[in-house]
Design a protein with these regions (language model features):
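Acidic, glycine/proline-rich low-complexity segments that act as flexible tails and inter-domain linkers
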Residues: 1-61, 90, 116-133
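Alpha-helical scaffolds flanking conserved acidic
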Residues: 59-64, 95-100
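Mid-chain, well-packed structural core segment of small domains
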Residues: 73-99
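Amphipathic, charged-and-aliphatic alpha-helical interface segments
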Residues: 62-77
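Alpha-helix C-capping/helix-to-loop hinge sites
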Residues: 50-54, 68-72, 88, 105-108
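C-terminal structural segments of small proteins and small subunits
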Residues: 108-117
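Short acidic/histidine-centered micro-motifs embedded in hydrophobic/aromatic stretches
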Residues: 67-68, 101-104, 123
Length: 133
């Protein structure tokens, strides 16, 4: 049976189950996306599940990394942080391990300083030079 011949709700449930099978859960975060575009979600599920089917990292480590990715200042996706904390705990992550992820990812924010501070120093020098001219 071709994909287009499968009723929407049936295909939606199959895709949710495929995600559950691959990742061990299906969070409500995905409901809106899967409801809007089944084809996109199907491709996302295939792509994002590759590390779950192959690779050297255990599931707990993968979930800890996912927490860091979702919590990073470049993403800050709180529903993802919550979903991956739940999964990490199910895989045996400790409070200390999860806290260490937050400590590690917080260092990303230092780039605001390392980018901004040299510009600030340059502008201070420029302002001083203009003042003296």
């Amino acid at each position: 049976m071709a994909t287009e011949d499968v009723p929407f709700e049936e295909r939606k449930e199959r895709l949710k189950e495929a995600f559950r099978t691959s990742r061990g859960y299906f969070d409500e975060v995905w409901d809106e996306i899967i409801g809007l575009d089944l084809d996109f979600f199907e491709q996302y599920e295939k792509f994002s599940s590759v590390p779950w089917h192959h690779g050297a990292l255990d599931p707990k480590t993968k979930e800890l990394i996912a927490i860091g990715l979702n919590a990073s200042v470049t993403h800050m996706y709180m529903p993802g942080v919550r979903a991956h904390i739940r999964q990490a705990l199910k895989f045996g992550a400790t409070r200390q391990e999860i806290m260490e992820v937050f400590q590690l990812v917080s260092v990303l924010g230092v780039h605001s300083l390392t980018v901004g501070l040299p510009i600030f120093v340059e502008e201070l020098k420029r302002a001083e030079h203009e003042k003296d001219s």
